[in-house]
């Protein structure tokens, strides 16, 4: 049902009662999911332009200039609500939707990333959601031949009842082949191609704009789309061939709000109208009505603008790939969205009003009185036991059980595989891209502004340890109910933090999506604010890339950046039962300089190993690097007055661990930013010495801790 206030606005504009079909169009296109009515004022604060940005926000995906005539398409989407109701299909179609966004820009998809957020795996329900979502992503991505090269998986009890499935997709094409969703000329035909239209996903856009109820699994299952990756692969090849042959004037994939959304947005973007003949749509089910035909979100469908003389050629291509296709309307000079069904006009709406008339507003915001939970833990009597507890946490442990289900080498571009700070793909003989994703939800819950800044800095450092400078950022802004002033305050401040940090690094925010109403009636919880981002950067492949693990005995270990005692939102506090207590470590003012110095050190070719320090702090970072060999570290001189657990587990941003056989030369490159040589690589254990403590952890103990998630899943 349309909100009463919206209905009043619509009646006034139309001068009459809207028809049932018109109400459906407004219900979906004016939903939070489609119109960003609560978030639009905040999204305008991002810097979205830059020297490499060809197309920024507003199209199906952004287009970023690379080199040698190549451009990158990048987009990010969420499929959160559907993945709770039907986890396999919800996750699978989340992949399919963002992949079609890339295709509709004329680019071939070359990489996926999947930041995922779950409740702890100690309940059958959370375990089921986790397993099925991973299977859904793997089942779809593997079948269409697009590698998943990086990801993040984070567990927290607040995601019980509302897991988050965010997907980043990257594509590649020549600049002259770039396509847009901006309609070109009145009189051109609209062709719907791909799968036939059924009733699956009906009302998906409006479904994604409300909280999840206790009965959601049963009641909302029809709102979840069902995907077919083999059809998606055919749609991909057919679309790219049609674009390559010059038949397509503009193009848009069918996602939220189905044909009604895609065809109206395509026409409106070019200042034109559209006349749709709903009967002409290839239908999967008999006796579908106009409402269902227009708004069903059946997957694997595209709408093309085609000149009349090219219609037969496009339909021949559709037939060649054994797909469904038909002319379902045309573009008009009159800027109206008109729908005919069985000889009658069932909708006739000013198109700009439909696609851009939803009232937007910045909602009331108010800082929560109590943001902290629990209290700071005492310094542990058994430091090694605490250390091992952190290493064994599912948030710190290896995610090999997940990424081994993905084909991460298909297309033969993968240079750095999953399991390191960022994935790396080869684009040309000399250049590649690094990709990273994620955020720190617990820190953002305590301090949304700092949490937003930290997300940018951490991902930038993930790229930096591979020598990559950031080119572009996309985001999925996952929050609770924006009508709650405290939630909107979180949202507003996290967005401001993201934007400020991105500007400090001169990286434009070129696209993404907003997912609100992530709350669960079943668990009486809202998700922690989760401003998940994807970041890509350019890598020089002529210089050997450092490993994320210790690689050469005798290398000097260098700590870059400054460690501070603030521990708010840390994995250590969570493992010690402290909840979200304490102050979140601030992003240092010299973070851009630190990141730049690390990039220069990597580009020098003098590093054998490099790793970002984030979740779990220096302790977890060192342990992670001890995959093949150990190291001896002495921090007694640099820990200052910090307690041992503070120094080991602080998650202060803008830090990295480097290993080199040429410490003097690397230190010269790091001149001007905080750094210190803290030890050497070698041996069969990690040894850490401080003022008042010594730790000895064998490689076997580290391996067992890192395999905790894999062992848990393999035990069934």
UniProtKB/Swiss-Prot annotation:
Functional pathway: Purine metabolism; IMP biosynthesis via de novo pathway; 5-amino-1-(5-phospho-D-ribosyl)imidazole from N(2)-formyl-N(1)-(5-phospho-D-ribosyl)glycinamide: step 1/2
Record-listed Mg(2+) 2 binding positions: 101, 253
EC annotation from Swiss-Prot or TrEMBL: 6.3.5.3
Domain of life: Archaea
GO molecular function: ATP binding; magnesium ion binding; phosphoribosylformylglycinamidine synthase activity
Active site: 33, 79 (proton acceptor)
Record's GO cellular component terms: cytoplasm
Catalytic activity: N(2)-formyl-N(1)-(5-phospho-beta-D-ribosyl)glycinamide + L-glutamine + ATP + H2O = 2-formamido-N(1)-(5-O-phospho-beta-D-ribosyl)acetamidine + L-glutamate + ADP + phosphate + H(+)
Protein residues bound to ATP: 36, 475, 512
Entry's localization field: Cytoplasm
Top-rank EC class of the record's enzyme: ligase
Any single biological process term in GO: 'de novo' IMP biosynthetic process
Binding partners and assembly: Monomer. Part of the FGAM synthase complex composed of 1 PurL, 1 PurQ and 2 PurS subunits.
Function, as annotated: Part of the phosphoribosylformylglycinamidine synthase complex involved in the purines biosynthetic pathway. Catalyzes the ATP-dependent conversion of formylglycinamide ribonucleotide (FGAR) and glutamine to yield formylglycinamidine ribonucleotide (FGAM) and glutamate. The FGAM synthase complex is composed of three subunits. PurQ produces an ammonia molecule by converting glutamine to glutamate. PurL transfers the ammonia molecule to FGAR to form FGAM in an ATP-dependent manner.
Family classification: Belongs to the FGAMS family.
NCBIfam families found in the cross-reference section: FGAM_synth_II, PRK01213.1
Name of the protein this chain belongs to: Phosphoribosylformylglycinamidine synthase subunit PurL
Taxonomic classification: Archaea, Methanobacteriati, Methanobacteriota, Stenosarchaea group, Methanomicrobia
């Amino acid at each position: 049902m349309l909100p009463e206030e919206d209905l009043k606005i619509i009646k006034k504009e139309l001068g009459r009662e809207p028809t049932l079909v018109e109400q459906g169009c407004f219900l979906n296109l004016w939903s939070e999911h489609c119109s960003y009515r609560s978030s639009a004022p905040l999204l305008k604060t991002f810097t979205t332009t830059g020297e490499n940005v060809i197309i920024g926000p507003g199209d199906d995906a952004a287009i970023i200039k690379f080199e040698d005539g190549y451009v990158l398409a990048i987009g990010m989407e969420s499929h959160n609500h559907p993945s709770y109701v039907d986890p396999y299909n919800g996750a699978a179609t989340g992949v399919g939707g963002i992949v079609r966004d890339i295709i509709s820009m004329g680019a071939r998809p070359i990489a996926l990333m999947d930041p995922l957020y779950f409740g702890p795996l100690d309940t059958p329900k959370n375990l089921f959601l986790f397993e099925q979502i991973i299977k859904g992503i793997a089942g779809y991505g593997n079948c269409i031949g697009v590698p998943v090269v990086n990801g993040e998986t984070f567990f927290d009890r607040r995601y019980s009842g509302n897991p988050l499935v965010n997907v980043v997709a990257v594509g590649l094409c020549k600049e002259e082949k770039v396509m847009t969703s901006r309609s070109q000329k009145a009189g051109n035909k609209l062709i719907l191609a791909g799968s036939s239209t059924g009733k699956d996903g009906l009302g998906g856009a409006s479904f994604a704009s409300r909280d999840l109820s206790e009965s959601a699994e049963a009641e909302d299952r029809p709102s979840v789309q069902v995907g077919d990756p083999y059809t998606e692969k055919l749609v991909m090849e057919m679309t790219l061939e049609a674009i390559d042959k010059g038949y397509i004037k503009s193009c848009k994939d069918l996602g939220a709000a189905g044909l009604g959304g895609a065809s109206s947005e395509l026409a409106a973007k070019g200042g034109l109208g559209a006349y749709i003949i709903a009967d002409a749509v290839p239908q999967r089910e008999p006796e579908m009505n106009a409402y269902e035909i227009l708004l069903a979100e059946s997957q694997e469908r595209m709408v093309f603008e085609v000149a009349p003389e090219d219609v037969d050629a496009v339909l021949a291509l559709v037939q060649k790939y054994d797909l469904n296709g038909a002319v379902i309307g045309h573009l008009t000079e009159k800027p109206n969205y008109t729908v005919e069904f069985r000889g009658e006009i069932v909708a006739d709406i000013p198109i700009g009003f439909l696609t851009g008339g939803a009232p937007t507003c910045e909602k009331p915001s108010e800082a929560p009185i109590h943001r902290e939970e629990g209290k700071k833990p005492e310094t542990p009597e058994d430091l090694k036991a605490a250390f091992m507890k952190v290493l064994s946490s599912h948030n710190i442990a290896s995610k090999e059980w997940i990424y081994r289900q993905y084909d991460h080498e298909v297309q033969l571009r993968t240079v750095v595989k999953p399991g390191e700070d960022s994935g790396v793909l080869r684009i040309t003989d000399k250049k590649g891209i690094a990709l990273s994703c994620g955020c720190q939800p617990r820190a953002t819950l305590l301090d949304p502004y700092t949490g937003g800044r930290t997300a940018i800095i951490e991902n930038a450092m993930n790229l930096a340890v591979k020598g990559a400078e950031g080119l572009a950022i996309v985001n999925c802004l996952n929050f609770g109910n924006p009508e709650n002033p405290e939630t909107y305050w979180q949202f507003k401040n996290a967005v401001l933090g993201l934007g400020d940090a991105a500007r400090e690094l001169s990286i434009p925010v070129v696209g993404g999506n907003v997912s609100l109403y992530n709350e669960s009636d079943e668990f009486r919880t809202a998700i922690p604010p989760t401003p998940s981002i994807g970041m890509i950067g350019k890598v020089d492949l002529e210089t050997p890339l450092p490993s994320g693990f210790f690689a050469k005995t005798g290398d000097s270990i260098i700590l870059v950046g400054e460690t501070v005692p603030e521990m708010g939102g840390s994995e250590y506090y969570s493992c010690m039962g402290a909840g979200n207590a304490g102050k979140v470590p601030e992003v240092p003012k010299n973070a851009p300089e630190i990141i730049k110095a690390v990039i220069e050190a990597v580009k020098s070719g003098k590093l054998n190993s490099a790793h970002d320090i984030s979740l779990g702090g220096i302790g977890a970072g060192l342990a992670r690097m001890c995959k093949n060999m150990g190291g001896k570290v002495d921090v007694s001189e640099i820990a200052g007055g910090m307690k041992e657990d503070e120094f080991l587990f602080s998650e202060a941003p803008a830090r990295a661990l480097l290993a080199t056989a040429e410490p003097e030369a690397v230190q010269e490159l790091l001149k001007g930013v905080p750094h210190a040589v803290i030890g050497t690589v070698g041996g069969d254990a990690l040894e850490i010495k401080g003022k008042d403590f010594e730790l000895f952890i064998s490689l076997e103990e580290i391996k067992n801790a890192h395999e905790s998630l894999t062992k848990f899943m393999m035990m069934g």
